[in-house]
């Protein structure tokens, strides 16, 4: 007779689980049992030798255990802390200009098309499908200035089961493409409408995020009002900072009375412990100290920083200042929608900084793996809910099969000594793609392969 279990058990897996903790950048748990409640939370993760005890406690039979093959493993879902959903329409192209020219020539004209909800429906459906298929279980999305289209993005992420923050972009300055901006009053009013309608929907895993595009596209009045909206509704804030040198000089010219770029956001109520700022390539020590004091986060977007020749973020310096940091794809300045690409680029950028003697060491693959999972969850304030396989967290996970059909990975005899080796895990992180991601879970629910309803 087994004990009454609360909450009821939905899934039990036996096999290898790979995740990060704050003391260990990559922990490989071989031959373990993991149980998921029907509410999607992890209720146990123990060695398989404890099966009999767990079966009595949680009332499951051996036939209910799903056993992974010796070459498969689970890892936490990937967290994309910065991605522009509308820019997916031209991802993989048009990365031939520096940031400000790139925005004016490619980005703003593309985003203006999203005044059509039909365009939004098509592109947003595709970007959510594509990112989920590639293992992004949590995404922090920029939409456009169009409220209704941004609401469609939220609806689509909820329908597919992706965990997300969704932001309606705000910009009341844009002299170069004047048709793509709002008045200050419109931007504030539409942000309030966006937030109100999002909160009324009460999506379980999709939340609104206040989204001033960046300092060059927002007046002080707008920034201050957006900061107040975020404070009133206790919301997260996302924007960009110190992406390239030309941008930083333009901010100095536009707002000469402020000490630096960070000070503009800080003085206008936009730098809080619920703020995530993309890039930060050129933040000074003084600015990093302010980030740390405020509890604000940085989204490291190495593909975009390289593709647009913007800069090289020194992640070790950010971590030294105790600033929270995760990884972002930054589609479409970053040409890849894959967080695996972000992992690889982050390692390479760190290697370049070592080569140039900026640092005395580099980031390891294991440390970057942690940034893409647990680090990203912390940057978005979700580390008590997701990011690894700790008991009590929701089961956001990827089932990885390095031997999947048409896999880009070749495995050899030496890759296996009994259970899966760390070499196989590394091969997936460096060589793998969506063909190796056989199943994706968000909150305990399998969302990939996609159901017929989506």
UniProtKB/Swiss-Prot annotation:
GO terms for cellular component: cytosol. Binds 1 zinc ion per subunit. It is an enzyme of class 3 (hydrolase). Catalyzes the hydrolytic deamination of guanine, producing xanthine and ammonia. Homodimer. NCBIfam families: guan_deamin. PANTHER family: GUANINE DEAMINASE. This is Guanine deaminase. The gene is Gda.
């Amino acid at each position: 007779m087994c004990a009454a279990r609360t909450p009821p058990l939905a899934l039990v897996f036996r096999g290898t689980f790979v995740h990060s903790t704050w003391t260990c950048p990559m922990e490989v748990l071989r031959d373990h049992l993991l149980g998921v409640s029907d509410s999607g939370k992890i209720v146990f993760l123990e060695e398989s030798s404890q099966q009999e005890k767990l079966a009595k406690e949680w009332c499951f039979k051996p036939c209910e255990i799903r056993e992974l093959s010796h070459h498969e493993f689970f890892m936490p879902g990937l967290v994309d802390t910065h991605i522009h959903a509308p820019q997916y329409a031209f991802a993989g192209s048009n990365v031939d200009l520096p940031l400000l020219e790139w925005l004016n020539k490619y980005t703003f004209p593309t985003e203006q098309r999203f005044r059509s909800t039909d365009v939004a429906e098509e592109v947003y459906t595709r970007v959510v499908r594509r990112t989920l298929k590639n293992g992004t279980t949590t995404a922090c999305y920029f939409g456009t200035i169009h409220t209704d289209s941004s609401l469609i993005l939220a609806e689509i992420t909820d329908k597919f089961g992706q965990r997300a923050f969704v932001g309606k972009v705000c910009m009341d300055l844009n002299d170069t493409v004047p048709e793509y901006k709002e008045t200050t009053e419109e931007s504030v009013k539409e942000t309030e409408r966006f937030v109100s309608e999002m909160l009324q929907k009460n999506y379980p895993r999709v939340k609104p995020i206040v989204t001033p595009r960046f300092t060059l596209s927002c007046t002080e009045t707008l920034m201050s009002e957006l900061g107040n909206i975020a404070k009133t509704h206790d919301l997260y804030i996302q924007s960009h900072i110190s992406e390239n040198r030309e941008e930083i000089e333009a901010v100095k010219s536009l707002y000469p009375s402020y000490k630096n770029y960070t000070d503009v956001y800080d003085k206008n109520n936009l730098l809080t412990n619920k703020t995530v700022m993309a890039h930060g390539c050129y933040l000074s020590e003084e600015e990093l100290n302010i980030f740390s004091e405020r509890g604000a986060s940085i989204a490291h977007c190495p593909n975009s920083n390289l593709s647009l020749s913007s800069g090289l973020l020194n992640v070790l310096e950010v971590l030294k200042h105790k600033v929270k940091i995760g990884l972002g794809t930054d589609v479409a300045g970053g040409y890849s929608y894959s967080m695996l690409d972000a992992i690889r680029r982050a390692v390479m950028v760190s290697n370049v900084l070592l080569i140039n003697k900026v640092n005395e060491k580099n980031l390891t693959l294991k440390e970057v793996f942690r940034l893409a999972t647990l680090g990203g969850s912390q940057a978005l304030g979700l580390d008590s809910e997701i990011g690894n396989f700790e008991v009590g967290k929701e089961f956001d996970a990827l089932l990885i099969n390095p031997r999947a059909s048409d896999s880009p990975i070749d495995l050899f005899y030496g890759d296996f000594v009994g259970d899966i080796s760390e070499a196989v895990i590394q091969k997936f992180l460096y060589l793998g793609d969506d063909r190796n991601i056989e199943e994706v879970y968000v909150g305990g629910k399998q969302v990939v392969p996609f159901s017929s309803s989506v």
